[in-house]
């Protein structure tokens, strides 16, 4: 078995945690995620074109944001050739995206990966069981 490549974190960015129904309730997760990804790339001192992949974890998917990782990647200025995928592992989704980024780099599948989580719980659909049939 070949030796695994070393992985380093070169940048980290986050938004403040808001309150449910608070001042960020109308801000889509894609907008918040793109802001963070763009700033992380800037702080790392790299060009978006060197990012091989974007991995975003998200617990609650909103229909119009069905492919949140790709939408965040494009909105953050990544080239359309940059691959992206979303991860759902409930509360561990953001951490799982980082684990997958590490594995991709260790095994030589990628050199530069942006990973994290994006969520706006205030925008998740409101589920009412049996409301459809009365």
Range-by-range predicted roles:
Residues 13-17:
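Short polar catalytic/cofactor-binding loops
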Residues 10:
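Ligand-binding pocket segment of bilobal, Venus flytrap-like solute-binding proteins
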């Amino acid at each position: 078995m070949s030796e695994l490549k070393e992985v380093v974190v070169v940048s980290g960015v986050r938004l403040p945690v808001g309150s449910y129904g608070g001042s960020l309730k109308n801000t889509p997760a894609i907008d918040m995620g793109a802001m963070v990804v763009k700033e992380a790339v800037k702080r790392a001192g790299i060009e978006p074109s060197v990012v091989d992949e974007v991995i975003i974890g998200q617990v609650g998917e909103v229909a119009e944001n069905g492919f949140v990782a790709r939408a965040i990647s494009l909105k953050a200025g990544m080239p359309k050739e940059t691959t992206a995928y979303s991860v759902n592992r409930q509360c561990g989704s953001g951490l799982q995206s980082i684990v997958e980024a590490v594995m991709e780099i260790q095994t030589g599948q990628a050199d530069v990966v942006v990973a994290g989580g994006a969520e706006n719980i205030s925008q998740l659909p409101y589920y009412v069981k049996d409301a459809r049939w009365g």
